[in-house]
Amino acid sequence: MRDVRVEIMADGASKLFGENKLSRPVESLSEAELYEIAALEEKLRSCVGAKAGPFLAWDSVNRAMIRHWCEAMGDNNPAYSDPAVAAVMGTPAGAVIAPPTMMQAWTMTGFGGQHPPGSDTREQNPAMRHFAEHGYLAVVATNCEQEYAQPICEGDKLSGYSTIEFVSERKTTALGVGYFVTQLTEYRNQHDEVVGTMRFRILKYKPLLPL
């Protein structure tokens, strides 16, 4: 199957986020502020390239969850409900395929915040802890890029492996001063085959107004 790449952009993101690196010129920041920035950025650099995983799915890919997703999204593609149509994609006999955009849903923790036994117990994104320690408490998602390598079939059991791929320089935005963080997650099936990847970008920032 040919790789497919999809980018999902948060509405108005290009308007929200500016290009300036600092909220004030460097020379107007106090020595204490500069020290704090340097300390945070040293911690962030140590996080780039950090890998964690596997993070296992609680459930195998199943038709009920596919149906719920499709109903919520208004997606009536017959390959997601009719095994005969899905068979054209090379699925096992009697199986349907899952919407590729649903890829990340299978390994999410849910409200309990826990992954199944056998999952990596390390932080998926240790940079988040460092941001909180330095007062960058607000977060907004900016965009998501997904690439699909092969169909996700009913009965598959997915796992995710995450890497902090990039942390930007300190930026000034209309929301506040912060950093853009890109996290790359690779999704594999029970045969250790890559089914797709997702790059998820967020802005961690100090809000202009109190939370």
Each model region followed by its residue ranges:
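A generic "cationic amphipathic patch" detector
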Residues: D82, S159, L175-V177, M198, ...
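Hot-dog-fold acyl-thioester-processing enzymes
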Residues: R2-N143, L211
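Generic structural detector for well-ordered beta-strands
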Residues: S60, E147, R201-L203
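Surface-exposed, gly/pro-biased binding rims or lids
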Residues: R188-L211
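Short, low-complexity, polar/charged sequence segments that are solvent-exposed and flexible
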Residues: H115-P116, R122-N125, E165, Y179-Q183, ...
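Hydrophobic beta-sheet segments that form the core/acyl-binding groove
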Residues: T142-N189
